[in-house]
């Protein structure tokens, strides 16, 4: 690995614990991080000679990938809704499916929004970037809130971030929209996840007990009943296995206009509901 064009073959030869297409993507992300080159830049600069520092950086990335560390944590950043976000293992890595949740919310008119379980701040910051609305967000993790605040600065937006536990959140403010992508993967489903997720992403943000999979949805819905403005909306990202149970729970709590939306993979992923 002495010139730029050798990088992708080196990644493919060294990394066998991810699909080929993902490894190629990891290589391009690494090149962009180290050299600032796009894919087209790679063609123009294919004969660029790598320095010893470049080679050491790339070998470190390859070594970390072989340990199943997510590329986003290795590089310390990811992209969401066209914005750059810093991430580490105290924050869940933003997913493409969650971009659909943001885009859906942006179809509505609102003056105030609360994001519950904000993590890296990706939902709150993306919405604040694209609206003039007042945006607030909470997370139980102080480390996540610290990262979210840094991401707000990076993206030049104002969001009211607070460290708070939704189960002990005494907030008198009301909002036009409340949104949450809460923990929704049952502990028994760990075996179905890639090792890089289970070993490195924060379990606090991922998993719920099999005995009470709707614990966060129920609490957030109850909170929304008292803290949504009249005709306000509640948005959830969900585990598709529990879509019917969540709809039933919202119906029992007298939410109206309940809608189930599919994601880009044709899976039940978002539930929108409203109060009268």
Would you name each region that the model predicts?
Residues 75, 163-164, 238, 262:
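Short loop/edge segments at beta-strand edges and connector loops
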Residues 97-192, 219:
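Conserved SAM/SAH cofactor-binding pocket of Class I
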Residues 33-107:
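Conserved AdoMet
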Residues 84, 134, 158-160, 256-259:
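Conserved beta-strand segments of alpha/beta enzyme cores
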Residues 1-58:
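A short N-terminal interaction module
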Residues 210-273:
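Conserved Class I SAM-dependent methyltransferase catalytic core
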Residues 184-215:
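Mobile active-site "lid"/loop adjacent to the S-adenosyl-L-methionine
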Residues 127, 197, 220, 224:
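Class I S-adenosylmethionine-dependent transferase superfamily signal
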């Amino acid at each position: 690995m002495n010139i730029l064009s050798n990088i992708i073959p080196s990644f493919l030869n060294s990394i066998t614990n991810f699909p080929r297409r993902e490894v190629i993507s990891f290589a391009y992300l690494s090149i962009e991080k180290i050299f600032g080159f796009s894919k087209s830049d790679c063609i123009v600069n294919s004969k660029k000679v790598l320095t010893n520092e470049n080679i050491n950086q790339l070998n470190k990335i390859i070594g970390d990938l072989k340990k199943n560390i997510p590329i986003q944590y290795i590089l310390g950043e990811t992209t969401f809704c066209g914005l750059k976000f810093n991430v580490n293992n105290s924050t869940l890595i933003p997913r493409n499916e969650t971009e659909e949740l943001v885009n859906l919310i942006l179809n509505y008119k609102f003056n105030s929004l609360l994001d519950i379980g904000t993590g890296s701040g990706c939902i709150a910051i993306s919405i604040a970037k694209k609206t003039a609305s007042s945006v607030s967000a909470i997370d139980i993790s102080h480390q996540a809130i610290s990262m979210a605040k840094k991401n707000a600065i990076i993206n030049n937006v104002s969001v009211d971030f607070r460290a708070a536990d939704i189960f002990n959140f005494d907030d008198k403010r009301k909002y036009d929209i409340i949104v949450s992508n809460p923990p929704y993967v049952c502990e028994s489903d760990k075996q179905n996840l890639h090792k890089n997720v289970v070993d490195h992403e924060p379990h606090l943000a991922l998993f719920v007990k099999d005995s009470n999979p709707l614990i966060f949805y129920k609490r957030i819905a109850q909170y929304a009943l008292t803290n949504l403005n009249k005709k306000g909306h509640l948005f959830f990202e969900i585990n598709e296995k529990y879509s019917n149970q969540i709809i039933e729970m919202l119906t029992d709590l007298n939410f109206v206009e309940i809608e189930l939306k599919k994601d880009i993979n044709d899976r039940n992923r978002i539930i929108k509901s409203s109060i009268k």
